[in-house]
């Protein structure tokens, strides 16, 4: 299901009136722009990692991105460039997967593999992920920024399914791929690849496979809104 369309279900009319007015760019919006009048910037338009090669600084009232930042090669650098597009007094609205709800303590992401280059948390010091960013910290460190709001969005998310299929033992073995011991890394890779190839892809059996609830109508994400001070 389209992520922006799903997210808009939990947004009140005031959200659109306050943040998505004027000149809006939707980075990674594809065929599901956050609002009809948004200018979409996607792969065909250039590399969002270096968006200032294509767009002028301080030229947008709102910079929106949904499930795009996690694909960038250098997360802080991309986030900083996107911020430079915002006019003084404008806003940046960013939605990213929540690492506990989406990745479910599995890295690389079991749904996107290496497509996701980082995971995200919200105002927690520690993370199980080797490549985790606190999106709140990234936001507050932007120049002339004020964080308007930051929230976990979990519409229709069934916490009863969280971590049910990939058991504790399997999770431990999966995490061995980052072990300092070569034997553990190899064993972890072999076990996971065996399950993936023989049970989750080639077979109709899904025993042991984690549940990606965002494949239907659930949200498992963080939304943060930042204002650029005049």
What is each stretch, according to the model?
Residues 1-9:
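Conserved SAM-binding loop and adjacent beta-strand
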Residues 9-13, 19-104, 224-226:
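Conserved SAM-binding loop
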Residues 15-19, 76-83, 91-230:
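S-adenosyl-L-methionine-dependent methyltransferase catalytic module, highlighting the catalytic core
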């Amino acid at each position: 299901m389209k992520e922006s369309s799903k997210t808009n279900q939990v947004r009140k009319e005031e959200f659109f009136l306050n943040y998505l007015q004027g000149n809006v760019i939707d980075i990674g919006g594809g065929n599901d722009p956050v609002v009809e009048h948004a200018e979409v910037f996607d792969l065909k338009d250039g590399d969002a990692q270096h968006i200032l090669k294509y767009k002028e600084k301080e030229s947008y009232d709102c910079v929106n991105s949904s499930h795009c930042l996690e694909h960038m090669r250098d997360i802080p650098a991309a986030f900083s460039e996107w911020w430079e597009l915002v006019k003084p007094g404008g806003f940046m609205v960013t939605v990213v997967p929540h690492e506990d709800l989406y990745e479910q303590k599995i890295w690389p992401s079991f749904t996107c593999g290496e497509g996701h280059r980082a995971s995200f948390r919200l105002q927690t010091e520690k993370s199980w992920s080797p490549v985790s960013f606190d999106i709140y910290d990234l936001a507050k460190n932007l120049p002339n920024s004020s964080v308007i709001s930051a929230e976990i969005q979990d519409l229709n998310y069934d916490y009863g399914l969280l971590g049910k299929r990939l058991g504790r033992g399997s999770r431990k073995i999966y995490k061995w791929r980052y072990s300092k011991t070569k034997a553990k890394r190899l064993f972890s890779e072999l076990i996971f690849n065996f399950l993936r190839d023989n049970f989750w892809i080639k077979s109709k059996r899904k025993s042991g496979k984690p549940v990606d609830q965002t494949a239907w109508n659930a949200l498992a994400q963080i939304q943060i809104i930042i204002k650029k001070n005049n």
